[in-house]
């Protein structure tokens, strides 16, 4: 009889754990889709202010000009040949991608409301796709698998966000 009680206890513990997991999933979803607060707005504005510098404007202009002319290198080797580490262009690439890294980090840990961020900045699909090969090359070359991982996470979350937030204007 004692054995049977132990088994029953294990089963009920497993059921509770399963219920707890389901509840945690609901809580996480509720947190992710919460209505933005004034604190969320302030964090978004602070992030915008942080990247509102001359070098950030230069970095964005450089990235978009190279992208539109199809001059943005698509491999790490081509990137290094054209823009060696320490060059102004390498710094601009670093700065351009760093703002997405920081936003991804803040969203990942729940400090920045993703609805608010993606509603303001969009999907980042182009930014990630055009930067991805260089970033992956840097990860490998520097033996740093975490280099710009939050930018990558941001892009993945943005794609998922777009699926659930269709365009409201035509």
Where are these regions (language model features)?
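Acidic, Ser/Pro/Thr-rich low-complexity regulatory regions
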Residues: 2-170
């Amino acid at each position: 009889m004692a054995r049977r009680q132990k088994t029953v206890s294990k089963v009920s513990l497993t059921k509770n754990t399963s219920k707890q997991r389901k509840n945690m999933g609901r809580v996480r979803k509720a947190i992710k889709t919460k209505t933005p607060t004034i604190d969320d707005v302030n964090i978004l504005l602070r992030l915008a202010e942080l990247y509102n510098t001359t070098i950030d404007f230069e970095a964005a202009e450089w990235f978009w000009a190279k992208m539109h002319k199809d001059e943005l290198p698509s491999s790490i080797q081509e990137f290094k040949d054209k823009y060696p580490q320490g060059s102004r262009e390498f710094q601009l690439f670093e700065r351009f991608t760093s703002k997405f890294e920081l936003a991804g980090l803040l969203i990942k840990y729940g400090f920045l409301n993703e609805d608010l961020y993606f509603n303001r900045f969009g999907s980042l699909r182009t930014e990630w796709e055009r930067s991805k090969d260089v970033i992956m090359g840097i990860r490998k070359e520097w033996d740093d698998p975490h280099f710009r991982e939050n930018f990558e996470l941001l892009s993945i979350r943005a794609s998922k966000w777009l699926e659930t937030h269709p365009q409201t204007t035509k």
